[in-house]
């Protein structure tokens, strides 16, 4: 059986950051690495789930909404994948992502999609935890200026 592309990445060398993970046709998969892999530090489910709700909503309502294909968590709980059409340059993606992270920090209302009708596990959401994670990731993004 062929090994999938994500297993070909040497996770012992990954640091928190923002990377181009792969390109498939006109879709760029960005690795939004919040935690260093295999250190025992991971995002808990409430944090990941809430970040997913918030960032997915903000990105799909941004100026690049038509180019956002997907945003969701990594199974290893160390970050997220953001899939965007290649017509949007990485620098612009990071700029819009920073805005979405900041908007999450400023959110004072309810978590988007926080009802039984909208979400299959709506009780597992915590805006405070998501704000903490997004604030920490914004610090990581300050040092990002290359994407490979």
What are these regions (language model features)?
Residues 1-38, 143-147:
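Non-catalytic terminal extensions that flank enzyme cores
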Residues 19-21, 42-46, 60-63, 83, ...:
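Generic alpha-helix signal with a bias toward terminal, lower-confidence helices
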Residues 27-61, 70-71:
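Active/ligand-binding-proximal structured segments within catalytic/core domains
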Residues 53-64, 99-102, 106:
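Short, intrinsically disordered, mixed-charge
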Residues 73-143:
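Active-site-adjacent, His/Asp/Glu-enriched structural segments that form or flank metal-binding
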